[in-house]
Amino acid sequence: MRSNPTXSGSEVSAVEKKNLGRIVQIIGPVLDVAFPPGKMPYIYNALVVQGRDNEQMNVTCEVQQILGNNRVRAVAMSDTDGLMRGMEVIDTGVSISVPVGGATLGRIFNVLGEPVDKLGPVDTKTTSPIHRSAPAFIQLDTKLSIFETGIKVVDLLAPYRRGGKIGLFGGAGVGKTVLIMELINNIAKAHGGVSVFGGVGERTREGNDLYMEMKESGVINEENIAESKVALVYGQMNEPPGARMRVGLTALTMAEYFRDVNEQDVLLFIDNIFRFVQAGSEVSALLGRMPSAVGYQPTLSTEMGTLQERITSTKEGSITSIQAVYVPADDLTDPAPATTFAHLDATTVLSRGLAAKGIYPAVDPLDSTSTMLQPRIVGEEHYETAQRVKETLQRYKELQDIIAILGLDELSEEDRLTVARARKIERFLSQPFFVAEVFTGSPGKYVGLAETIRGFQLILSGELDGLPEQAFYLVGNIDEATAKAMNLKT
């Protein structure tokens, strides 16, 4: 049964304070705590370490194992510096609960739901436990529908499923952050939805950069924080493995409230899902479990499934999740990315080659995939257009070696025409972003799916063969490309 959000604060009641234990062993971020007989805490209960002379250390731990001899083993959510054997530990009687609702927008939280942005306490008494079961099958919305993003290359070639999971693959500096911010902006404007960003085990500098860029682009409104479109939850790579393992659940819990109670469409970003697995692996070793393949935890599939199954569409609203996936040593057979792939509905692959050409978003049109690109789901017209675009780009890719050695003149008339159209398509797949207006000076464009299909059909039909390829670069719909061509001629 799903546990509902509670309207109680995080204070420990006087009754619960009586359930005190003592630290008997500390190994890094793992604590063993002894409790009186018959007063053992439950698995996933939050424990709070009490300092000497009632000085609160504010180290929250989560019960992971019950060992026998009235001992439990718990994982700390923050540094264990300064802890000693014999210190008192309070069993709160509940699992970690975090603030939820509109008051979380525009704020930055840690794994415990505590604000870390120095903007004061969160203006809400509504909290929700981070451990919940996935929605029952009868609550799910099984209708397959496209989640329109307004980004041409995504909507045409690798469309997102409403309530689906998308893997975002790309190295450093190819535009992951800008793409994420544009999606946050577009869901707010086109769908009236909100976003939750979970920074799992990534660099603190990147989290800070993202926050600053969101403020610059208006995704976070400093003047009126309530008008912000995103809540941020961070558990960065300098934090203990317990925090990195649970921060994804904290972000998901906030997203679930917007879906189930506010009945909104929510975009949940997890950067990086590999770090979630990595943290689980560290915790598993510390808890003394036997490692599985490549040293990963034996519970890898279960942990991933528990998180991913909560990300879904219900009859109230949807959570569409975009997860950055780091592939260790580019080995796609590694258990961490391989387990992630089993849950994904679409993949968006960012290409360094396209970024080097200045084509943004640098989404690789041939490597990006989607299970939604089927005629029975997207319709014959969309499917045919997407397939013809891919065929044209694939043929251009095959001819590039010949062009590099012999030049364009050695190609047949038909191949020269294919190359010309492919270059127009490649440029038309770029588009100006709203969140990049600050840097580019070009106003952002949201292009509807019907407009996108019409534009590519016109290029493929040959009607625009006479226009220069520069006219298709960084424009919105096809009418802007023809207008730009007229300007270039004059």
Swiss-Prot record:
Produces ATP from ADP in the presence of a proton gradient across the membrane. The catalytic sites are hosted primarily by the beta subunits. The keyword Transport applies. PROSITE patterns: ATPASE_ALPHA_BETA (PS00152). The lineage of its organism: Eukaryota, Viridiplantae, Streptophyta, Embryophyta, Tracheophyta. NCBIfam families: atpD. It catalyses: ATP + H2O + 4 H(+)(in) = ADP + phosphate + 5 H(+)(out). Signal peptide: none annotated. ATP binds at residues 170-177. Gene3D superfamilies: 2.40.10.170, Bovine Mitochondrial F1-atpase, Atp Synthase Beta Chain, Chain D, domain 3 (1.10.1140.10), P-loop containing nucleotide triphosphate hydrolases (3.40.50.300). It is a peripheral membrane protein. This is ATP synthase subunit beta, chloroplastic. F-type ATPases have 2 components, CF(1) - the catalytic core - and CF(0) - the membrane proton channel. CF(1) has five subunits: alpha(3), beta(3), gamma(1), delta(1), epsilon(1). CF(0) has four main subunits: a(1), b(1), b'(1) and c(9-12). Its main location: plastid. GO terms for cellular component: chloroplast thylakoid membrane; mitochondrion; proton-transporting ATP synthase complex. It comes from Cressa truxillensis. It holds the Pfam family ATP-synt_VA_C. It is found in: Plastid, Chloroplast thylakoid membrane. Keywords: ATP synthesis, ATP-binding, CF(1), Chloroplast, Hydrogen ion transport, Ion transport, Membrane, Nucleotide-binding, Plastid, Thylakoid, Translocase, Transport. GO terms for biological process: proton motive force-driven mitochondrial ATP synthesis. The keyword RNA-binding does not apply.
